[in-house]
């Protein structure tokens, strides 16, 4: 025992039982144990865990396995076990005090890390010696002390004399020991922390050992005195000491004196902690025990004192503690008893704090094990007095203190049996202060705003108050009044559970009696809030119907104001919600509240243009009603006729009076109720299927379904007519309009009979027609509505089997319209606002997402999937609705082209036109005065794609009219035909980008048309005529013509016949419109058109017949125009055309080309002979044969010219002609010779 242990070693109870004959370390106070898991409260070698307390209480051997040998070593000396205490008691206690002194001297040594190990071992050994001695005293009293008869006159042995004196000696020595060690509070400050060495062994300073040894001494003295009394069954008088009253000191008086001093010490320790470290807000989280050993000492005292009070006239623990605490609460020093307790700064607060924490120790049993189910002994009498003092302070009660007091009181209500008197005392205070906010200026009250927010939040507050476990942060989150409500709830619930309704009647009488008309009129807004909180809580824990009816009677005394009306409505609606949660009939409340709602809705409608203050107040009340009714529907297990009362014509009036933001709230309410009705209907259908054979259950479920239908009919009556009237309006938020319409459609599917007569006999189809297929509805509404509709597989399946065979085609039509009109909503915004914005960004993000979702769902329709499957066009990714529409148009065109039979083609044309509907109406908004670049671009691109992809369809007589209208509307509107008017730049840009699509499509139609259509050919010519010139570059650069839409149409055309037709038409337009020389007036923009022709000839396989049409104009330009650029371009054209003719005729001179030149010579040879020769020289350089074929014509033209002028031989002309002939080889030389011969003959 003298050696220092490496760590805290002890034997558990089970090991102690197994090793019955082995020495066990005696129990002692120790906080050196591992509690990282949080499960252990005391050390294994403590008085509780080791079973030492139990042995004392049950009067068992304190240490059955110790001190069994004949001798025992105490303080390093061997003693005879059975006689040592009798023979040498004073010596032993003297040695004990010496050891104490040795330990105290160790405190003077410095505790650095180098010395701590030695100091720890020394102090530990001293403590073990002292504790072992006191346990030896206990064991000696139990085993060896003999009870002698004091009246016996028989001679006794000297030992027996000493033995008889031992109890008095022990009282003397124990009293002297207590005087020597003094009070716990007088010990030097102790650091309860430990040093940890490299072996992870905890080493404690001497001060720690001294504190714990003092604790051991204080407790073991009590044990020894208790055992002495139990053993002797009589009072033991001291021989040396008297108590403070002058009486002889006895074991009983010493026990009581020491017990009182020890409790005073513990209170002082707690006081020191309370005054320095405890804030009111942290009172219950700040414990009063500096270490577990102090806590153990409290528990030991509780058990020991309560045990003694049961079997003797001694006082219980609570009486001891109450007696001491009362001295703290005395107002004058003269009235206080002479106890050694420091006066605290807050006696009331400290008393609440210490009582609450000490009460929690009652949960520990004799082994130190917590047992929450254990019945705890209460101390209500003292707490009642404490509570009265707490709320009757004359100087005024501080809220921050009151919260702490009541929080402690609430905790005690958890521990102890219910006490109605507590509620009565508190109610007397709060009934007088209902108008107080119970707030703390420096602490924001979280709960107040939370409570006032809504009826549901008021109920949540009540539920919080009724919870069995309260938040530790209650001080900061709730007022003292709220904590009072928690106390009220807990006490009433517990009392009614134990004693039936009688406690409730007591409480009800006390509370109801405080409210009458005058008191109700005195309540402020805060007072009303507290009033509702109180009665809602009473309704929650007791008779809700009785409380609610009483509250309504009390409210009739009030005349609501603008400030109090919202609160009154919230409170009333909170009772309605409580009825619903408790599954009670809400009929009476629903009738009363819905009538009030109707009246307020009527006022709201009338006050539409009145001042905003009154309107805002009315809207607040109406919002409270809607929020509460929504909550009623969402929390009701099933609907009853009384639910229909909540939906009256007040909503019809309200809807007409609402502005946009207010409408959002009403429609949110509507959607929530619709969703709840459908959910309940689905549950009923499932239950009907499960209970197919049980007629009684089926009858009950059918009744519930009728109730559902009645509520649904009310919604149709009071909401739908307004929604229907707002289909084309922008007052109602479009997304909510679509959502509400979709919900009504699903309701029509579930309960078709509830729909109004104008939607019958097929309400679902009628609804979709109104909100999904009608072309006058905003596309934002349609897209969102159809997305809801297509997501519901049951609805789609029902439509498929309802005879509505066109529902897929009509849905596709609406989808096309939604895409084409995606920019319509932005037409009111100036177009320059979107200069730097991507077109997709010009569309609302929500709408683009909705279009994407609609596209995804649409591509799942069987009809659409079938089209893509037949066309073998891959289904596009729906992330880009515009690209998806283009792919759809292409897929339809390819599918039609793959059809073989006439009937299939005719049906496909009909279906395709059904997809388009009045498509020109969809794009009409973009073609008005308000310009949208993105909208025009979208329109022209989509329609161009349609014209090209559906060219074969437009070739049919059924579809050709639509094609004509498209061309007239988009490419040949009146503004285009009026040459003096410039087209808007965005429109011109859109046409330029999409014109190739139209031209190619029109050419295909012309080639494939079932009947020769002169009008269509004329349209094609008109389009080319209008846009060739509009898109010619300002300067005649051939490089700039590469992107001319007319040329692009030729480049990108995959089929030869349409390209040939298009080129032929282009050539005719150029010849007609740009090569008409009227007198001296030259055709406009000759250079640009020549550049265009040059590009045309270079990039296409120009036919000789087309060159035959263009070449005269080019020759005229060379002949008649002197502008250098025109001459250069005309020369290049001439060269290209000659080369093209060479290629086309296989190297032989083309007859058509020769014919063109011959006619040119005949027309202009008389006047422009020199220019003609110059032109032909250029031609001869490319193709001599062409010019050789023209020699006879040229010679004849020369002769005719000479004859006309009548001047004989024209030498200059002949010389120019000879120059040309000299370039023609032998044929030219022969002709020169022939002309010379003719001249000679004429001379002769």
UniProtKB/Swiss-Prot annotation:
Cellular component aspect of the GO annotation: nuclear replication fork; site of DNA damage
Posttranslational mods: Degraded by the ubiquitin-proteasome system upon replication stress.
Source organism superkingdom: Eukaryota
InterPro entries according to UniProt: MMS22-like (IPR042320), MMS22L_C (IPR029424), MMS22L_N (IPR029425)
UniProt entry keywords in alphabetical sequence: Chromatin regulator, Chromosome, DNA damage, DNA repair, DNA-binding, Nucleus
GO BP term (any one): replication fork processing
Annotated TM spans: none
Pfam families assigned: MMS22L_C (PF14911), MMS22L_N (PF14910)
An MF annotation (GO) of this entry: single-stranded DNA binding
Compartment(s): Nucleus; Chromosome
Complex formation: Component of the MMS22L-TONSL complex, a complex at least composed of MMS22L and TONSL/NFKBIL2. Interacts with RAD51; interaction is direct.
Function: Component of the MMS22L-TONSL complex, a complex that promotes homologous recombination-mediated repair of double-strand breaks (DSBs) at stalled or collapsed replication forks. The MMS22L-TONSL complex is required to maintain genome integrity during DNA replication. It mediates the assembly of RAD51 filaments on single-stranded DNA (ssDNA): the MMS22L-TONSL complex is recruited to DSBs following histone replacement by histone chaperones and eviction of the replication protein A complex (RPA/RP-A) from DSBs.
UniProt family annotation: Belongs to the MMS22 family. MMS22L subfamily.
Name listed for the protein in its UniProt record: Protein MMS22-like
Protein species of origin: Bos taurus
Gene (UniProt): MMS22L
